[in-house]
């Protein structure tokens, strides 16, 4: 694109035929985050990068994008040694990154967001008409349909992601790093994204695709590199990969990916919502006349794009948000707006979405967190006054062993545990109460594939015991794997409910966007 007086100047440079990272080492205090990792990307390919939390994926890509600097090793672009000092440096070398959590300003338009941080040949004046025209040109080339004049807050999640891609392309990115790009997309939006990625690859771009969804990796990538404990396990052509093989490479042992559920033996209703309404944190409608029944011995999955009332639903049931209309009953008793302690006393357990905020107290020990809400129970106290710490530690040690929680001791502060082990601790605590009703909100978000496997097994075991489980998840694969019934939420309402028996994924995706 020629640079005229009225244009913003894109900073990207020429095509990247090859990018190679060799012997990359990165140390943090007490941690070897990257241990002589080799990784390369070629023009025209989609290279998937897999690994559990802490495997080194983020560290490696942050070094490629200039956020970290390697202690040892070399980066070469088109066979020329290259030092990337900052994200600006990375952009100038033709490297763009699409973060999992979009870096957009909601109140600004598409064109204004794309122009942020760019240099103008007119000093402080930005000719947004020129930016908009270039955005439309790129949109046509790569089928990234978006109106440059719309504010970001009016766009769907999939459209916001297109803006992120457009911004990188506008800056001249020849290589794109995509971090968990499908995490919050509907099935239809995933299909649209994959068409865009394939077109970018066909046009000569190199793409790094970071994901934990193995079936998507197999569908979209040409090669796969797996990291474990800061080291590269292997790089193989995707044509030679299978889901079990990739999972075993990630974890170091065989992983159960498919679950054989026992036949449904549903019992009486344990939880019922009748026309429940509630306000969101912004004072707008969060829930709109939601009705739902949950029976003992079944898992009901709540599917939907994030922000469509799932959080409000969980909080209304668990006494953390006021129900403004309608009723909530547990085992036939009206518990509408009952306090959490009262709900806990009648057998309702809750695995919260934000485990570090609502699930644990970071400065408390593992043992102290294990007995949260139960610290006054007769089995842990004398006359409900003096706590029996030996009994608390004994119970906690049994839970650590049963739930395979990795911790140095019961006295270790929770803040030092990994996300997966914190989630196992919350799960152990909630299930130790033998609940009649379990609300599980995003139970595997941000945890490793090994911990995910364990949590899924525990939920299915709890189902078979007769517990009524409400599973709220943004991961449609998780919903489909565990649920007996699936209800879809959109704009605070339940817009559809299906029995999970060869469910039509496309139909679910349509419901998630408000279709019928």
Where would I find each of the regions flagged by the language model?
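Glycine-rich phosphate-binding loops of nucleotide-dependent enzymes
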Residues: 2-516
